[in-house]
């Protein structure tokens, strides 16, 4: 499809320059975009969590879940989507390949709390939420979060009781290196905390999947040299990663370098909704450059990732017998219409969100269409950097929540770029003619299970079928004013149908090896604060962070034992 759309195909076996040159003749679409004479339309900024899909799912008997007998204790799924699994599919753990990993996920700033305890230094999220509470929906912060720093044993017990295989969590960089650098000193209390967590997991039969960086840059590095806007951070991240591999790698066999670099670069530097809260002044930030900084930050993120992978492969992989990858997020995009322009726009949107990171990892350079449209604002890799980045993963983590429609936006060659988000010339929307692409869950997730399967198949076709873990997938309830929202049928439905799509993708040859539900517990949801709840486990923030299983946990536990 990519060649028909006038976009370059990615090769897993050729160098970046060769792939780019061989595909240049395939870009009539890019040329047409560059020469279009219409004025550029105003494009919609991303929705608040920026994952925005189209399928009505029809439960077989009006409910999705478990009945009484052992043969019925599996999830029956019927789908009205043309590419979904066959009309009735019975699902349980045994439906998936042997060794498939089921897990749940979290992130340090979202759950740990203890922001100024145990020797931890501040991160940019501490500064952002303290200095700009108006940027958070309920003016809250992660100072206490879910108190997992002190209640980690309770969380491990919940994982075990559910029957999950793995726990994906992140390490707080500033809890290990309070000043962000090796020279600033290693915090042994932080080392001990993560050792205790890892050991508790293993004692209970739960394997850790550890993310090194989930957006919480040490504030000291932001103050010293502007954080990920500077290439200086690459060596400091490499030192931090080296410490983690050395201290924890004898027990951690699954490493993720970065979580959702797109979210940091776009939400943190194009719109200022996330830390460090930078964007151009006309988007409401005191300082920033929405047209350039996201590209600079992404460039340094990719170099930091590649250098950390090299350290692991050179010094640890052979003896520790682990694997290392990166987690990328993406929506799936359906063309707004059947027109060639909208079909091409859907692929272009994928290039600007997913390909922005995946193309360098596979091919050593950014997508050709980005080079054509962004031009000199898109940084270049040296030959050595390109070779370092290319192939720097054992697996790819994919975070999927929802999908959007993609509509071609008319382009002018002489426009003045003001935001990287609009450089794709794609209007994105969760609705078409006032009709949502799928039922709305929470405030921003349109229920579209088919999008997950289509994204997985796209990655298989375009990027040489890498090993994949679904590292985040889940839905939310908006916080209720009264009562305890333990009744969460939408989560049960969401997970049922998305797992069915994962299974179908596996049957079609995609190398998916695991699925991690977001999230184990309710938590601090970034700019949403505590107004939305993604957890399998309810957190009572008013009563000592009491943990209570929601209704979906009963279903999920049975699913995992079937």
From Swiss-Prot:
Its EC number is 3.2.1.186. It is found in: Plastid, Chloroplast. GO terms for cellular component: chloroplast. GO terms for biological process: carbohydrate metabolic process. Partially inhibited by glucono-1,5-lactone, conduritol beta-epoxide and diosgenin, but not by beta-sitosterol or cholesterol. A beta-D-glucoside binds at residues 110, 214, 259-260, 401, 472, 518, 525-526, 534. GO terms for molecular function: beta-glucosidase activity. Residues 1-44 form a transit peptide. The active site is at residues 260, 472. PROSITE patterns: GLYCOSYL_HYDROL_F1_2. Its main location: plastid. InterPro entries: Glyco_hydro_1, Glyco_hydro_1_N_CS, Glycoside_hydrolase_SF. It catalyses: protodioscin + H2O = 26-deglucoprotodioscin + D-glucose. Disulfide bonds join 279-285. Keywords: Chloroplast, Disulfide bond, Glycosidase, Hydrolase, Plastid, Transit peptide. Optimum pH is 5.0-5.5. Belongs to the glycosyl hydrolase 1 family. Enzymatic conversion of furostanol glycosides to spirostanol glycosides proceeds only after plants are harvested. Under normal physiological conditions, the enzyme and its substrate might be compartmented spatially and/or chemically. Beta-glucosidase involved in saponin metabolism. Highly specific for the cleavage of C-26-bound glucose moiety of furostanol glycosides such as protogracillin and protodioscin. No activity with nuatigenin glycoside. Convers furostanol glycosides to spirostanol glycosides. Heterodimer. The N-terminus of the larger subunit is blocked and the smaller subunit might be derived from the larger one. This is Furostanol glycoside 26-O-beta-glucosidase. It comes from Hellenia speciosa (Crepe ginger). The lineage of its organism: Eukaryota, Viridiplantae, Streptophyta, Embryophyta, Tracheophyta. The gene is F26G.
